[in-house]
Amino acid sequence: MDDIYKAAVEQLTEEQKNEFKAAFDIFVLGAEDGCISTKELGKVMRMLGQNPTPEELQEMIDEVDEDGSGTVDFDEFLVMMVRCMKDDSKGKSEEELSDLFRMFDKNADGYIDLDELKMMLQATGETITEDDIEELMKDGDKNNDGRIDYDEFLEFMKGVE
């Protein structure tokens, strides 16, 4: 395994480690060796908000399952989660943000106007006031043209993460 990922594990907060441990423990119940099978690994990672493709999952497993046992212990799991978090913070998230922008941009004109923002936020089912919506629009609309373009949207969403 790469030392860079092992070093990154050391940078995880106790809260992150505890969250990962809790998820890992759910799936390790009943396992005599304290390891989870590679079949269960995808479920654990999805539970933690990661969404690796089957190919990515198999690649990660192959990299950490050095003895070919088909199981992953907690230390190996932490290294995998760090890797997944790193991958999620680039590339994929840009694609996801692009998809999200297109969802908001109902008329596909390349901008999110106040009505589109209002429609999407109300569709979430959350209680949100007109003032809240206007405040969000003001925060996102950096050039004050009354609409949010893609670059403004990216900048706004990066501040949210």
Curated annotation (Swiss-Prot):
Chain positions recorded as Ca(2+) 2 binding sites: D105, N107, D109, Y111, E116
GO CC field: cardiac Troponin complex; sarcomere
Binding site for Ca(2+) 3: D141, N143, D145, R147, E152
Lineage of source species: Eukaryota, Metazoa, Chordata, Craniata, Vertebrata
Family membership noted in the UniProt record: Belongs to the troponin C family.
Note: Cardiac muscle Tn-C can bind 3 calcium ions per molecule. Domain I does not bind calcium.
UniProt function note: Troponin is the central regulatory protein of striated muscle contraction. Tn consists of three components: Tn-I which is the inhibitor of actomyosin ATPase, Tn-T which contains the binding site for tropomyosin and Tn-C. The binding of calcium to Tn-C abolishes the inhibitory action of Tn on actin filaments.
Keywords: Acetylation, Calcium, Metal-binding, Muscle protein, Phosphoprotein, Repeat
Underlying gene: Tnnc1
N-acetylmethionine, modified sites: M1
Domain EF-hand, first and last residues per copy: 16-51, 52-87, 92-127, 128-161
Recorded GO MF terms: actin filament binding; calcium ion binding; calcium-dependent protein binding; protein homodimerization activity; troponin I binding; troponin T binding
Protein name per UniProt: Troponin C, slow skeletal and cardiac muscles
Chain positions found as Phosphoserine: S98
